[in-house]
């Protein structure tokens, strides 16, 4: 009565309320649903499915109610089973027993694609939901599961294989994965070998690698802790293990990055190998390496798979800037490690820089102009240009600008650099210079109509766009477009807000303008928090979410389709800032993500593929061909 009374109270309080009841001891759960017509009780057994499964398995063991006998392809042993049970667990058996096939009416069926061990494993799993695996029965089980389309067993086999990969069995596991099209396992084996390749070289398993997997490994940017010479020697060892393998020599050598070896190594260790002198493809690979090394200034526009850095680590990189407290100019080159959430140092510049220009061609970083000493008027502008090679973590000097310049914009466009406007001790500049890496020289192109400094720029569709800036002490909102093919400037729709010392970048087909500053009143500077993007198709501007905090004279980079605005100066707070803000174009949202190690104004940023500093620890040295004696 007490139970019924409790139910009535619930119904009176809320006639639509559900009440859940449970009994772990009985393996039963229930809920009550009330309505105007009365109370309906729903019960669920938590043990029913396992009891039914156990019951079917007992019937199978005792040979009761079995209506078909399965015979493996490799013997005469028979396995009495229930058609309904097999069809419920396998699309293969469902089609066999219900699809009008001749086996539908047979009492004994021979399965030619399955052996005794595999068939027993599959039947045991279907009736018990349990599976025991070891390397002795794995392949038989895999073969049966693939043939009979038992997906859970295939998944268990994948887990078993992945969990047991080692140096001793990775080649065999890879073979099994390839045979049965186990994509996840195959990918895991590749990653394991890439991570442990130096250790694998010291085992007898290395020479057992199939050609396809070895070629993949040698072509991968994820292969670490090996020099190209070591990879070449490993490839030669694999080729010589069996004479028929020599037919793969040219195909395998295409994956070795000969241009990154020193000339001495090419002469002493590569050209002395017979097939490198006799095979036409291999000879051409050596010629390619020689030509590449003979033209150091041209290398950024000669990049190929064999000249690229062997690294998969692309990061946000910052360079230079002026320190907040001491007003000392930095020469630090840093990358941000997203996994470790920390900044790590790369090779510093030879000289400090701020308010400089940076651009990337072929994953080479160019640093152009700027200032080495703190001066707000640009009187200490320089004309020197340096290039950073992340493959060797080294800098080299290239041809200087025709004019010293700072507060300018630098773009990389169609394999050239364009330095636009700026200022120096002589005043504001309207001139534009173009750097040709093939000639290692700067030449003038069409200048702007008016001198500009503190402007920003970006490239899209083979054109360079320049926005805002300062002309004759007046902030601008104009947008200009430069076509390098016609050497002409054209005017586009102006921004909605005047701004200078802002930043600009391209994401997809949109040209974003962010931050900066302008006059508040007649003489006081004010942060510009508003942002907007330009559509080249519509020739119009659209506002987007405002920045969280003002930043001028910053570094800007696009990384994984997000915009990062780094450091700079806040006019509202009258100080350099260390903040890094990220804008998500898809969500139209700003977030503060992390900080610089110190507050830096006039800093610059980009994305670059590098060797993270820890990859250099304990790794073979990477000697630049340019610095080899």
Curated annotation (Swiss-Prot):
One of its GO terms (biological process) is protein ubiquitination. Pathway: Protein modification; protein ubiquitination. Keywords: Cell cycle, Cell division, Kelch repeat, Mitosis, Repeat, Ubl conjugation pathway. Residues 170-271 form the BACK domain. GO terms for molecular function: cullin family protein binding. InterPro entries: BACK, BTB-kelch_protein, BTB/POZ_dom, Kelch-typ_b-propeller, Kelch_1, SKP1/BTB/POZ_sf. Residues 66-135 form the BTB domain. One of its GO terms (cellular component) is Cul3-RING ubiquitin ligase complex. Kelch repeats lie at residues 315-363, 364-415, 416-462, 464-509, 511-561, 562-610. Component of the BCR(KLHL9-KLHL13) E3 ubiquitin ligase complex, at least composed of CUL3, KLHL9, KLHL13 and RBX1. Interacts with AURKB. Substrate-specific adapter of a BCR (BTB-CUL3-RBX1) E3 ubiquitin-protein ligase complex required for mitotic progression and cytokinesis. The BCR(KLHL9-KLHL13) E3 ubiquitin ligase complex mediates the ubiquitination of AURKB and controls the dynamic behavior of AURKB on mitotic chromosomes and thereby coordinates faithful mitotic progression and completion of cytokinesis. This is Kelch-like protein 13.
